[in-house]
């Protein structure tokens, strides 16, 4: 399942050479059981805690707001240059990190650089570089006491602490042909 996502944006031509854009986006992870339900559901009695069901466990992610700003510089008829920034808090509460080891989306700040080359009216090449800055989340694998039945000999409550860290870099090259 994919969470509901919606947003609003505005773009302004500041000058003949500069455009500015701002976007706000909302991602509703809580609408998707496998993503929004807390991991504590796994420990429910009578087998009610199956993954992805109404009473099942999930990643425990919070809904999130994403804020984006961007600037485009129109150098000439053939070249445009873009710069963008994106911020969003990590959707993971510190007591819900166990399942998030499968999808450690903890990055919060992203910077994007791009260039578009238009050698003709119908051909366009775009290059982009995205850097998601390093971020680290740490906390309990789950809330205290929830997994005592599974880990009776542990001195801590359950499997212990979890630390997630992520940094990302990506490069994109696209070609467009306009008919």
Model-identified regions with their sequence ranges:
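Outer-membrane beta-barrel porins/channels
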Residues: 1-179
